[in-house]
Amino acid sequence: MAQVFNFSSGPAMLPADVLKQAQQELCDWNGLGTSVMEISHRGKEFIKVAEEAEHDFRELLNVPSNYKVLFCHGGGRGQFAAVPLNILGDKTTADYVDAGYWAASAIKEAKKYCTPNVFDAKVTVDGLRAVKPMREWQLSDNAAYLHYCPNETIDGIAIDETPDFGNEVVVAADFSSTILSRPIDVSRYGVIYAGAQKNIGPAGLTIVIVREDLLGKANIACPSILDYSILNDNDSMFNTPPTFAWYLSGLVFKWLKANGGVAAMDKINQQKAELLYGAIDNSDFYRNDVAKANRSRMNVPFQLADNALDKLFLEESFAAGLHALKGHRVVGGMRASIYNAMPLEGVIALTDFMADFERRHG
């Protein structure tokens, strides 16, 4: 079978070594004669899986001891509701920074539970899309927390600054598409959440990192399955968790550790992004309209000079083993998502194809 590279934004490519191990263990896990999908989440065998996964995740991100790690349902959209329901307390407003599609989606959901103070950070610089630096963000005095999305998958926009708004500001961030791709100073945040389907594992699992002093403030109307305190008190097993996704994510964590951890991912992700953006910038046939300071290393959108060639580009790239390059319906064009599991060889194959396509159709 020819090599296929999956550039999907999520569910995304998983490490080949992880898939092979899961395949080998699928019908007889740990010599039990059953699949890990079939065993009880409360049995000692799965409890060990869960504990190892949390331990490895904490180690990878150097999560401080005063933070809890929760393995949840609901995805990022579930957390759009969970954050205000858990963190507002007796306040009625929160600061939300709008830098793209997913930040706007979080704002829309938050309006059901509070009055968001929305700061539009989107700007245009020399004809390119950019984001205002954090020092220019206008925050309110009475907000329960500040929410932002460090990486916008659809827009290909990243906010790489580390927040430094003082100890009184609780920062909540949607790290769904950038978690584990580079080091994070977890201590600068009150809440970090991430859907698994991009850099962690398969869809169906969401991980929340929450500072323990923020627990116990949930709105009385908060569904129990979204209540951070209840999830923490029950070791993320208040109800049956997505056990297979949890197990696979644990394998990904071990793969990351075996391959140098987050620091190594940071380095290779920078290489991949520089290679792909270089191919775009050095061409008159392709273009990216995001300012260099805000370009995402995970999601690289690009347009062809003649969008009449889009369909042909997608057909030929798919035939060449380069899958899921179609841009999001909101922005069109192309998009290459190059998360941790995407090897450098995949990006090289893509840039080689782009150069060949340009020679033939430019």
Swiss-Prot record:
InterPro entries per the UniProt record, alphabetical = Aminotrans_V_dom, Aminotrans_V_PyrdxlP_BS, Pser_aminoTfrase, PyrdxlP-dep_Trfase, PyrdxlP-dep_Trfase_major, PyrdxlP-dep_Trfase_small
Entry cofactors: pyridoxal 5'-phosphate
* Gene Ontology CC: cytoplasm
Name the pathway it acts in: Amino-acid biosynthesis; L-serine biosynthesis; L-serine from 3-phospho-D-glycerate: step 2/3; Cofactor biosynthesis; pyridoxine 5'-phosphate biosynthesis; pyridoxine 5'-phosphate from D-erythrose 4-phosphate: step 3/5
Q: Does the keyword Amino-acid biosynthesis apply?
A: yes
Q: Which UniProt keywords apply?
A: Amino-acid biosynthesis, Aminotransferase, Cytoplasm, Pyridoxal phosphate, Pyridoxine biosynthesis, Serine biosynthesis, Transferase
EC numbers listed for it are 2.6.1.52
Query: Which residues are recorded as modified (N6-(pyridoxal phosphate)lysine)?
Result: K198
Q: What is its main location?
A: cytoplasm
Q: How is the cofactor bound?
A: Binds 1 pyridoxal phosphate per subunit.
**Family membership noted in the UniProt record:** Belongs to the class-V pyridoxal-phosphate-dependent aminotransferase family. SerC subfamily.
**Which NCBIfam families does the record match to this protein?**
PRK05355.1 (NF003764), serC_1 (TIGR01364)
Tell me, in a sentence or two, what this protein's role is.
Catalyzes the reversible conversion of 3-phosphohydroxypyruvate to phosphoserine and of 3-hydroxy-2-oxo-4-phosphonooxybutanoate to phosphohydroxythreonine.
Name it: Phosphoserine aminotransferase
Q: Which organism is it from?
A: Escherichia fergusonii (strain ATCC 35469 / DSM 13698 / CCUG 18766 / IAM 14443 / JCM 21226 / LMG 7866 / NBRC 102419 / NCTC 12128 / CDC 0568-73)
